[in-house]
Amino acid sequence: MRPIRPPAVAAAVTLLLASAGCGAPGALPPVESGSPTSTASPARGTASPTGPRAFTLVATGDVLPHTEIIQQAKEDAGGDGYDFGRMLAGVKPLISGADLAICHMETVYGADGGPFTGYPAFKSPPQVARALKEVGYTSCDTASNHTLDDGPAGIRRTLDAMDAVGLAHTGSARDADEAGRPALLRAGGATVAQLAYTYGTNGIPLPAGRPWAVNLIDRDRILADARAARQAGADLVVVSIHWGTEWQDTPNEQQLTLARELAAGQDGARADIDLILGTHAHVPQAYEKVNETWTVYGLGDQLAGHMFTYDGAEDPRGNWSSIARFTFAPPPAPGQRWTVSRAEFVPQVTDLGPPYRVLDLREAARREPARADYARALEHISSVVLSRGAAAAGLTMAP
């Protein structure tokens, strides 16, 4: 299943491991984000007197607090509550350094004080939301196969917790009105709409009378929602999709077909969708420029415990992922498309410790060049990410 490593990947990995003096990208001032109405406040993204400016968007994969992750958060809080921020501190410069930062919140939250559960029916501490906000996330999508693990109450608690800390959200809803609104975010003088959908909910039916509780994948609906977001004032539309085959490095046929169809969507001369961000497979998958729209088939897991395949074997790929970073440049004329002027990825790993810590894999490999597991993860992530020709389209590993 492991892709053949192209020469470009080998060169990039070798250069990275040799460049111990290179540091992480310089952080920009933090963006002010999400209000209880899921609309981020203008901050760095406010237009300058000379007009719109370029902005950066980062996106990460599944936040999946298994029981051992919950226990680590309790230990990090000294036994009093839950602190998920220490586990994410290693990637905070990357997240907070972007104008917009998007996460995928895989699970729903339990009531304050618990009880909390991991796999198979997740119920996470609501303190996760504060940690995500403090790390620098602007918005999280909440459409996944675990969205209905605790029914409508789980959705309500999750979105209430996000509202309380000012974290925007999209993909699940407490009422029909909320379901009809995308997350509208601001950066570079642009309004960015985020939409989110999942392939299913683990066989749990949508709650009676609540067909809008979680967005399910439907090509025509996604395109219609994207056009509605444009009508609501969005300059760019980002679609987060929970799809794919778990433990498969390569995108499946549904992913490839849907990506082509969504990227081909057009209303007049404007593309309907500007960026597609995939989650669910638990492993990193390829990036590809599809009909001028960058598509990330699978980001992998941002935060998870020990990961096991269906046959019971522990698989380290479940703790490897990529951070997508795209720089969008203003259109040459009003009404035209914002374009990606720089496309980058950052390899990431959850080091299982103890303690559990999410790390920028570039920095971790520079600090500990003798770690064979870091070198192996770096090589694999790079190989998979570039396996569908993204390097030729301009994608690079961030220096």
Predicted features and spans:
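Bacterial N-terminal signal peptides that target proteins for export
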Residues: M1-A11
